[in-house]
Structure formats: structure tokens, C-alpha cells
């Protein structure tokens, strides 16, 4: 059967649809990040407790993706993704009317379940429909949508909460996400290479175990766990740094700091093309080095250097995620949706775990403690990427370009 090639009209429709989907997912997910300081003040909770407004969502997102990834092998890709996006948008609107922090946490928890239907399947859809030589570019554009959504959600919610309130901020994100959901459903064509299977829990369980026993796949899962964990820890607590002395920025100005995440748009697309040309291993190692350098730059007290560090960190993060996620789609020969779901389970579990643990380092050691935790995590990720790079040089019947 014919796979979709870069430059064709259907390739452009698919990448536009997934760009909108990535935008939607990350705008909803991260719109609470600049609001955490306001949650701390309005609901009288600690910064660690306020971080749960993101952590509970990502944890349920991680767990639910294992279910949706398996169900999509039976029910198909597009229907689950479309329903998921619509439900998440409605729940975002409902969250805007939360009368208490507990209500907000309950709605954000349910939202995590709803959001899971898209990212758990997106990589499998792209891996099935896009030709291998164009997959890196397609995945890069999808993750570019993630970057824009993350920037948009953070900046818009921060600005609106400064001049109006956080209820209006989340309500606005909910309305915009509904529009993005419609764009996605209209533009995405049905799967052409998907073959439905009967739901056999025993076989699904064995397939999950098989993916986990694959050392190279498991290394990629752990890299995703560490990458997003470090990213969320940095952005959860950098807000407290910027709002406090010696900077004492107002919330509106500090929200604009998130504009540096726009480099993720260029990084994921650019790195996707680099992968198509040079293979996965070298590009993954390069990106993790960039993330480490960016984290260390944020220790400097000069605001300009700190912002440069955030920009470098973001460039490397989105590039590294683009490489690791598309590598999983190439490495898994069977049950690709399950493999993608496992990667994203670890990815978002890292967000939940380290997004909250970072609060303990913040409380005990302030920003230097948070950066120390992040640096240690990234050194482990670098070691894992080095293992993957070395494994490519060994004979491997699955080896194509880099590591299949």
C-alpha cells in the first residue's frame, strides 16, 4: 500500500490537523502553570500543593494512555482522538467555574483521562500512514503544535489572570480549544493502513510486557520520563523565582517569559529534518547536551542570561522529545499504539513525579536545588542516549537508519 509522502496535499492536511491537536493538548494541559502562584494565594495552599493542578492531570493522562492506546487497536484511531479532544475542551471550560481548589483538582483529574485519547494514538497514526523518510518531519510539526500550545496556554492564562482573573483565563483557553478540536476533526483523513483487532486482554498484556523487555525501547521510555520531568520542574518553579526578589516581576510580564518556548516550534521541525538526514542517535545526544547547558545557565542571576538558559533548555527539550518519540514509532514493529502509549506513560509520569518533587527541592534549597535535581536527571538521560548510540554500532537485524 502507498504511504503518504512529504509535499503532497494529504500530508499537509494531516500535519495541519496534528499541529492543531498538539496545540490543543498543550494549551489545556499547561494553562495552569502561570496560575499556580495565584492558586497559592487565593486557596491558601503551598507551592507544592499548587503544583498538583498540573501533576494530577499528567498522572491520569499517563495511566489512561495505556488504556486508550490498546482500545485504538480495536476501535480505530480517528474516532477516539476526536472524542478525546472534544471532551477535554468541555472540561477545560468547566474548570473555569471551580469554586474551590478541591473542585479544580477533581476536574483537572478527569481532564487528564480525556486528554489521553489523542497523544496515545497520534504517534501510532503517523507511524502507520506516513512514509519512513517523511516521519521525522511529520512528527516535528506535530510537536511544534505542542510548543505553540504550551506557549499560548501559559501566556494567555497569565495575562488574563493578571488583568481579569484565573476563571476568565481558563474559560478563554476552553473556547479556543473547542475551535482547535473542530479543525482537527475536519482535516484528519481516516486511517488507510489500520487493521482492527479483537480485544484480547491476554495478548495486549503480553505485548506491553514485550515492549518493556526491549532494552532499547525501555531506554527511550526512560529518556521521555526524565525529559518532561525536568521541563515541568523548571517551568513550575521558575515563576516563583521571577515573581520574587531580586526581579519582583508582575504576573503579566513574567508570563511573557514563556515566549521563549516558541523556539520549540523551530527546534522540533528542524531536528525532525536532521533526524531524517543523520539518524536518531547523534541528534538525541546533541539535544540532551543542549538541555543540560540551558538548565545550568538559569543559575546565573542576570535576568537576560536566565532567559537565554530557558530558551536553550526549551530548544533541546522539544528537539529531544521529537527524536525520542519518533524513534519509538520506528523501533516498535508491532502494536505501535501500545509502544507509543508506553512512551507517553513514562513521559507524563515524569511530569507528575518531578513536577511535585521539584517543590520539595524548592522549599529546601530554592532554585539551586531545583536545578541540581534537573541536572542529575538529564545526566542519567545522557547516559541512556549514549547506550542507544553504542547499540546502533552492534549488529541488529532491525537496524535501518540509526536504530529502527
Curated annotation (Swiss-Prot):
CDD domains: MFS_NepI_like. It is a multi-pass membrane protein. The keyword Transmembrane applies. InterPro entries: MFS (IPR011701), MFS_dom (IPR020846), MFS_trans_sf (IPR036259). Signal peptide: none annotated. It is found in: Cell membrane. One of its GO terms (cellular component) is plasma membrane. It holds the Pfam family MFS_1. Keywords: Cell membrane, Membrane, Transmembrane, Transmembrane helix, Transport. The keyword Cell membrane applies. It comes from the Bacteria. GO terms for molecular function: transmembrane transporter activity. The chain crosses the membrane at residues 16-36, 49-69, 79-99, 110-130, 133-153, 166-186, 221-241, 252-272, 283-303, 307-327, 342-362, 364-384. Its main location: membrane. Disulfide bonds: none annotated. Belongs to the major facilitator superfamily. This is Uncharacterized MFS-type transporter YybF. It comes from Bacillus subtilis (strain 168). The lineage of its organism: Bacteria, Bacillati, Bacillota, Bacilli, Bacillales.
